[in-house]
Amino acid sequence: MKKEPVVSLRDVLDRADAAARRGESAGAAIYPTGFHPLDSYLGGGLRSGELTLLGGPQGLGKTTMALQVARNVAASGCDVVYFSFEHDEVSLLTRLVALEAGLRDGTAAVTLRQVRQAVDATADSPSGLAGRLEGLGGGSDAVKAVGEYAERIVVHRSDGRRTSADVVRSVVAGFVKADRQPLVVVDYIQKVAVERDLPNEDERTTVVVEALKDLALEYGVPVLAIVAADKAGLAKTGRLRIFDLRGSSALAYEADVVLMLNDKYDVVARHHLVYDVANAERFRGWVVVSLEKNRSGLDRIDLEFRKVFEQGRFDTEGNAVAEQLTDDRVFVE
């Protein structure tokens, strides 16, 4: 529902009272990410009216995590509109099928590579895609599982030359008019077209992030946006922080929640490797998700989740990081 710009606190109190009497929440709608214990620190999950940023190095799984959150939200019965600037809809479907198989059959499930091969195959299959994946670690069941929530995920094949913040707003407005409050995923912010001729990337990023924050507030939807690192961040060998993201000052100010991904091997303190070299390989299998900003709760929290990239997913049951972390990368030969 589009929010009115002026409202009496008397009306707000009356609505809160009425909601309490009905046994309903008077606050923000909560969209669980499905990642534990991240949701507990976020007060249950992503919140309507808030902008959440997801940043980190290239190739560490930002899209993987965003798509997995989208899947979890859709599977819970909520709508998702996914603005995809780098992946087509078939690629996203392929990832979801592999992810779904992994959730059901664990590491014995069909791999992302095998699902891609099945999708790309040209041989006739009377049973469709499920038939091509029959006998491959729960592949056919995964196709059926995706089908149960696929209608609730709408993919917008976005274009860096034409898909502006106004286009994003227009698409979301169509959902809201139909009385649907979707999770909005933008993959990724720096690809969103800016109609004004601005001299540098920081200014363009500022325009986009401000527009996404306004969108979240105006329509009462949660927005999850992926953010790329700036040039210095891309060259950095240690831990990426919020100030390593493109347009970092605007991002830090406008966002309600900032999540930063880092490879655990790259950020764990030296003494954890020096005294137990075997840890090095173990740490490579985990990503550290740092809650760098959280307007609704605690921040500066470091959590870890196991990578299962052969199935295009993370293990959603994570832990608080027990080891000391550092901003400087430690190399062990």
List where the protein language model places each region:
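Glycine-rich nucleotide-phosphate-binding loops and adjacent flexible coil segments
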Residues: 35, 40-186, 191-226, 232-233, ...
